[in-house]
């Protein structure tokens, strides 16, 4: 009987300890914002805050026209950079000011900035999430693109 009680107490404790923490909502794939960025600091293992980000679109003349900018928040994210009306089919560039970020931490980085150039498709509302993983001498990017939403 004593071992059965101990087993039940242990199981109850495990259930309590494995309960997931509540999700803090700071954006989702269902957001009306068609473009979101997320930046992580691979050295410190946390979101990269206060990184300046510029978004540009290739013009018909072949040059980049900046149309949005911002700084990453406490989660390393920027939401609502643009609207569906502005974010039409075309070639886009997201520029991360990585040099200023590392220099503010007392690190001399190799890269001045990191660019992600991609094509956006207007076949319905899509949500683009551009993620960057940074270190002073390298960076990696990835994208998540939702299916078109009508």
From Swiss-Prot:
Instruction: Quote the tissue specificity entry.
Output: Detected in choroid plexus (at protein level). Detected in choroid plexus.
Q: Where in the cell is it found?
A: Secreted
Which residue windows are coiled coil?
none
Q: Name one GO cellular component term.
A: extracellular space
Subunit info? Answer: Homotetramer. Dimer of dimers. In the homotetramer, subunits assemble around a central channel that can accommodate two ligand molecules. Interacts with RBP4.
Give a short account of what the protein does.
Thyroid hormone-binding protein. Probably transports thyroxine from the bloodstream to the brain.
GO MF annotations for this entry? hormone activity; thyroid hormone binding
Q: How is it modified after translation?
A: Sulfonation of the reactive cysteine Cys-33 enhances the stability of the native conformation of TTR, avoiding misassembly of the protein leading to amyloid formation.
Q: Does the keyword Transcription apply?
A: no
Binding annotation for L-thyroxine: 38, 77, 140
Q: What are the UniProt keywords, alphabetically?
A: Hormone, Secreted, Signal, Sulfation, Thyroid hormone, Transport
| The name this protein goes by in its record | Transthyretin
Provide the family line: Belongs to the transthyretin family.
- Transport: is it a keyword of this entry? yes
Organism of this sequence: Tiliqua rugosa (Shingleback lizard)
> What residue intervals traverse the membrane?
none
